[in-house]
Design a protein with these regions (language model features):
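Trp/Phe/Arg-rich N-terminal binding region typifying the photolyase-homology
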Residues: 2-169
Length: 169
């Protein structure tokens, strides 16, 4: 049953269920700026996986320096995270680690890195099944993020209640 892995367009607003992912062997996760902590969530669930972090330089030197420090922090906190710099590095990592099932961070509009047809076609040709992982928080928040920040802002308390986060003040 591969219903959690889709080789095609990421399904809109279908929340991922890590319980279904636990049973997959040869599991890999790719981190990037869209989600730098997904591996921690899955590690807490006791899942066994390989992990790499895609770092792409930004044109703005301040943003680039900031992103470099964050990526260094991720790698320092988990020495099992492998750095990759481009899609070819990812393909090599997939082959070297014998990854057959791949988790990618869910990508929002304007933030697409992996939802690129040549990349997806190549990993499919490598016989790797993939899924774009949508965190529950993001799935709940997307419905309020359609009309600008102020619509989102007025619904923050609703989101906090859904996440069972209470104001401690």
């Amino acid at each position: 049953n591969n219903q959690n892995f889709t080789n095609g367009k990421a399904k809109d607003f279908i929340k991922s269920d890590e319980k279904k992912l636990i049973k997959y062997e040869n599991l890999g996760i790719i981190l990037n700026n869209n989600d730098l902590s997904l591996h921690q969530l899955l590690k807490e669930k006791g899942m066994v996986f390989e992990c790499c972090l895609l770092y792409k330089e930004h044109k703005n030197i301040l943003i680039n320096n900031f992103q470099k420090k964050i990526c260094e922090d991720v790698k320092n906190n988990d020495p099992n995270v492998v750095s990759v710099n481009n899609f070819h590095d990812i393909y090599k990592w997939l082959k070297d680690k014998n990854i057959k099932n791949l988790i990618l961070p869910y990508e929002t509009v304007g933030n697409k890195v992996f939802h690129e047809s040549n990349f997806l076609k190549t990993i499919t040709n490598l016989e790797v099944k993939y899924t774009f992982y949508l965190r529950e928080w993001d799935g709940n928040a997307f419905q309020y993020a359609t009309k600008g920040f102020f619509n989102f802002k007025k619904n923050i308390s609703t989101l906090l209640n859904q996440a069972n986060i209470k104001n401690k003040i």
